[in-house]
Structure formats: C-alpha cells, structure tokens
UniProtKB/Swiss-Prot annotation:
Protein name: 3-isopropylmalate dehydratase large subunit
Signal peptide: none
Organism: Pseudomonas paraeruginosa (strain DSM 24068 / PA7) (Pseudomonas aeruginosa (strain PA7))
Keywords: 4Fe-4S, Amino-acid biosynthesis, Branched-chain amino acid biosynthesis, Iron, Iron-sulfur, Leucine biosynthesis, Lyase, Metal-binding
Subunit structure of this chain's protein: Heterodimer of LeuC and LeuD.
Name of the gene: leuC
C-alpha cells in the first residue's frame, strides 16, 4: 500500500464522516474572521437562535476596509468615510463583543491582515484545519496546516457546528530544487510556477511545495508561496513541517506551552509526505533558472522574467490565446514586443497578505536605502501587514529608510491590494504591486497591476520603470 501525502494525512486527521455523495464532513480547528464576509453569517446565527459552537476556535480582525493613514486611524470608526465600510467594521466589533470572540480591533497593535495576524499570534499551528472567508487562507498551509477560504454561508456553518462539508482534492507536487540566485525570492518562485502551469493548472488539487529551494525558504517566504496557490488554480497550498516551522511557532500567544508543547511537537514532526506517497501531478522547476518576475497582463499567468518582452499576439497560432493577449495588451496599454523594462510606472505598492511581513519590508528597505523614489512616481506606499510588523520595522529603523527615500509609511491593512478602501489606482495608472491579483480593476477601476516581489517593487519605485533589482544590489 502506497504511503500518504501530507494532504492525505491532514484530511484523515479531520474526517468526521464520509458521505455517500462523495463529500465529507471535516472538523475545523481554527476559524479566522474579518469584516467583509462575517456580518451575514452572524445574522444567520441570530435568526436561527444559535451561538458559535466553540468560541475559542475563532479569532477576528478588520483588514479589508480599514484606512491606512495615521490621521484616519486615530479617528477610529468615525474616520472611515465610506458608509458601507464603516458599518462592516462596526458590525464585526459588535458581533465579536456579543459572542465573546477574540478580536484585534482597528487600533489594537495586534490588528492587521488576517493572514499575517493568524500566524504571528500562533493561532495557526501545524496539523490544523484553518478556514476564513477569504480565498488566500491558503497562506496558512506554510505551517503544514490544511487551510482554505470559504464563502459566507460556510462561515455561518463553521460558527454553528465547527464542521464543514467538503470534497477531497487530488494531490499535486511542485518540486523546486537548487539554489535561488541572489535577488530572486519566494514571490519569484510562485510567479514562475503560475507562469508554467497557468491559473487553471492546480484546479481540483491541493499543491504541496517541496524541494531544496522550498526548504531553504524562511517561514515567511513559504507563506508567500502558499498564499498564491490560489492564483495557480488550487484551493490549498502546503509545505511540510520542519524545524523552521516549529521554531517559528514556539512561544507565540496561542501556541501550546510546557508539557503540551512537547506533545504537540512530537505530533507535528510526522506532518510530512511519506517517501512512497503518490501524487496525481508532479511539476519540477530548477531554482537556479528563475529570474525576477513581472506580470505584464490581466492574469497572474501572464508573467515574464524582467529581461523579457511582452508577447506579440501575431506570433500566437491559437486564436483563443491570441485574443486573450490582444485584450490584455489593450487594457494594460502596452505594445507587442515592448520590453518589460520600458513600462512606465505611476504608483508602487508594497504590502498585502502576500508580502507585508517583516522579511518583505527588510528586502524592500535594502533597495530603498540611500536612494530616492523617482520623480515620475506619483505615490509609493509601504503598508505593514500588522501593527506588530509595523512596530518591529520601526524598531529596526526601516520606516526612516522608506520615508527618507520618499515612500509613504502607513498603518496596517489590506490597502491597495483591492479597491475596498481609500488606497486605489486611478484609471490608466500602472502599479508595481507586491499583491497577488492583477485582473482588470482589482486595484481600482481601469487600474493596471504588475505583480512583483518587494525588492523588485522598491527597485521600480526608485527607477520609475521596471529594472532587474540585481543591478541595484550588485
């Protein structure tokens, strides 16, 4: 009998009941809530006369709608200009207060983006099932946890029952071997993977990322990789547990302590795929061949190395692909065969649940140090992923590096990743962004998003156009 994959093990650990229709009932260990997808779920609970089944399994924080300027944040709820956004944040506060759920409110130093806050608080632990009403919950798979996004009706179901109906996925292995070149990061790995398999490549699969290049990554780098499993078409991304995982979790507020810690570690050390485990699909990449990546189009799969040119639709024989390229070029305002390094930028955004952790800010600050944002850049934002990340960055002096270079240093939140708060693009503007999605209008109606790593974003800010960051780090 073949061994089990990590995904198989996590599934079996949480299987409550297998159903005749092929679906199953899965137990959920951790539920993370934010202001956008939770109000209707709590209202459904009240209408049914129910309460959360296991209150301590839930944590919450507002992130999508919160303003990121210091002035607005000091003003509290009243300073949120948009009425719907203000109501959503207020409703989250009221619901958590009413039901006794732990919430890191807007001006709590522990507040931040849900997928930054969960891990940094130790609320995400190896072997857990983790869900949240947000597709990028896959981020938490970096800890060897089975984590994925859910819809609002499922948020209500988890609150009421601590279980979820799900169907088991296929197993995909993405193996990245070798050593990354200097200046190439986890973000470049995952963009290269998506460029290789496409945004539908992982459909119906849980992707496990493995290989020496993945093992060499920090936990923060692994979170970046798992975060963008969604853009590769998968619902789940995973990295096996190792000593780095255990060291990261140890001592965090929600982590086990004393005797329970030793028991937990003994359990976690088995959260790896067996040597003889079988995967339905295997994809292999050579880390040494990966260069800094830049997305050029309106899908994450439309991505190239920084030294390449955007495609010419006339050279594409497939009419569907040709049409897709033509539409993307038109929306993005680019010409066939235009060099990536000739794309003029208007704004730069360093932040989001993909790249707003302390390691990301350090990488960007290394590039920004002693340089100035180009005069042609209208705005360059740095938005830490949480109040604690911001606090640590300020302790290290990173805020001063950014401010002296001409960046804006903001309060934590989702910010310009999505047009649900005051930070957004104007129509026609090009933005170098460390976020995860670049479809039409994602950062604002008519906005044009280019996905890059934090180091590449900082390099673009000081250059005014894309440049291979390795030229600045040499």
């Amino acid at each position: 009998m073949a061994g089990k994959t990590l995904y198989d093990k996590l599934w079996d650990m949480h299987l409550v009941k297998q159903r005749d229709d092929g679906s199953a009932l899965i137990y959920i260990d951790r539920h993370i809530l934010h202001e956008v997808t939770s109000p209707q779920a709590f209202e459904g609970l009240r209408l049914a006369g129910r309460k959360p089944w296991r209150i301590d399994a839930n944590i919450a924080t507002p992130d999508h709608n919160v303003p990121t300027t210091r002035t607005e944040r000091k003003g509290g709820l009243a300073a949120i200009a948009d009425e719907v956004s203000r109501l959503q944040v207020q409703t989250l506060d009221e619901n958590c207060d009413d039901f006794g759920i732990t919430e890191f409110k807007m001006n709590d130093v522990r507040q931040g983006i849900v997928h930054v806050v969960g891990p940094e608080q130790g609320a995400t632990l190896p072997g857990m099932t983790v869900v949240c009403g947000d597709s990028h919950t896959s981020t938490h798979g970096a800890f060897g946890a089975l984590a994925h996004g859910i819809g609002t009706s499922e948020v209500e179901h988890v609150l009421a029952t601590q279980c979820l109906v799900a169907k088991k996925m296929k197993n995909m292995l993405v193996k990245v071997e070798g050593k990354l070149p200097a200046g190439v990061t986890a973000k470049d790995i995952v963009l290269a993977v998506i460029g290789r398999i496409g945004t539908a490549g992982g459909n119906g699969h849980a992707i496990e990322f493995a290989g020496s290049a993945i093992r060499d990554l920090s936990i923060e780098g692994r979170m970046t990789i798992c975060n963008m499993s969604i853009e590769a078409g998968a619902r789940v991304g995973l990295v096996a547990v190792d000593q780095k995982t255990i060291d990261y979790v140890k001592g965090r507020p929600f982590a086990p302590s004393a005797e329970q810690w030793e028991q937990a570690v003994a359990c976690w050390q088995g959260l790896v795929s067996d040597a003889d485990a079988r995967f339905d699909t295997v994809v292999e990449l050579d880390a040494a061949q990966i260069k800094p990546q830049v997305s050029w189009g309106t899908s994450p799969e439309m991505v190239l190395a920084v030294d390449q040119n955007v495609p010419d639709p006339a050279r594409e024989s497939d009419p569907i692909k040709r049409g897709s390229i033509e539409r993307a070029l038109k929306y993005m305002g680019l010409q066939p065969n235009q060099a990536i390094t000739d794309i003029q930028l208007d704004r730069v955004f360093i932040g989001s649940c993909t790249n707003s952790r302390i390691e990301d800010l350090r990488a960007a600050a290394e590039v920004a140090r002693g340089r100035k944002v180009a005069a042609t850049i209208k705005q360059a934002l740095v938005v830490p992923g949480s109040g604690l990340v911001k606090e640590q960055a300020e302790k290290e002096g990173l805020d001063r590096i950014f401010i002296e270079a001409g960046f804006e240093w903001r309060e934590p939140g989702c910010s310009m990743c999505l047009a649900m708060n005051p930070d957004r693009l104007e129509s026609g503007e090009h933005c170098a962004s460390t976020s995860n999605r670049n479809f039409e209008g994602r950062q604002g109606a008519g906005g044009r998003t280019h996905l890059v790593s934090p180091a590449m974003a900082a390099a673009a800010a000081v250059n005014g156009r894309f440049i291979d960051v390795r030229e600045l780090l040499a």
